[in-house]
From Swiss-Prot:
Component of the SKA complex, composed of SKA1, SKA2 and SKA3. The SKA complex is a homodimer organized around a central W-shaped coiled-coil structure, formed by the interacting domains of SKA1, SKA2, and SKA3, each end of the 'W' is extended further by the C-terminal microtubule-binding domains of SKA1 and SKA3; the complex forms extended structures on microtubules. May interact with NR3C1; the relevance of such interaction remains unclear in vivo. Interacts with the MIS12 complex subunit DSN1. InterPro entries: Ska2 (IPR026762), Ska2_N (IPR042091). The keyword Magnesium does not apply. Belongs to the SKA2 family. This is SKA complex subunit 2. It comes from Bos taurus (Bovine). Component of the SKA complex, a microtubule plus end-binding complex of the outer kinetochore that stabilizes spindle microtubule-kinetochore attachments, promotes alignment of chromosomes at the mitotic spindle equator (chromosome congression) and assists suppression of the spindle assembly checkpoint. Kinetochores, consisting of a centromere-associated inner segment and a microtubule-contacting outer segment, play a crucial role in chromosome segregation by mediating the physical connection between centromeric DNA and spindle microtubules. The lineage of its organism: Eukaryota, Metazoa, Chordata, Craniata, Vertebrata. One of its GO terms (molecular function) is microtubule binding. Coiled coil: none annotated.
Amino acid sequence: MEAEVDKLELMFQKADSDLDYIQYRLEYEIKTNYPDSAGKKNPVTLLKELSAIKSRYQTLHVRFKPIAVEQKETKSRICATFNKTMTLIQELQKETDLELLPLTEEEKTAAEQLRAHMSDL
C-alpha cells in the first residue's frame, strides 16, 4: 500500500514539474513571438497570476484536507449515533406495545432524504 502511495506522490510531482515546464515554455514563446501590445494585458503577467492562483489553491488544499477528513469522520459518527437511536426507539416501541401512526408526507420525504444522504457517506 505504501509503495502505491509513493508511486502516486511521484506522479503528482512529475505532473507539477511538467506544468512548470509548460508555463516556462509558454512565457518564452509569448515573449519572443508576441511583444507587448499597448492597451492589452501582458500574457506573461497573466501566466504569473495563474501561477500565484495555483500556489494559493495548493495551500488551501493542504489546509482543508484535514478538515474534510474530520468532516467525513464526524458524519460517520452522526450516522452511527442516529442508527443506534432509531434502533433504540424501535425496541422501546416494541416493548411498550406502542401503536405507530403512519408517517405524514413531510416525514416520508424527510426520511427518504436522510436515507439518501446517509448512503452517500
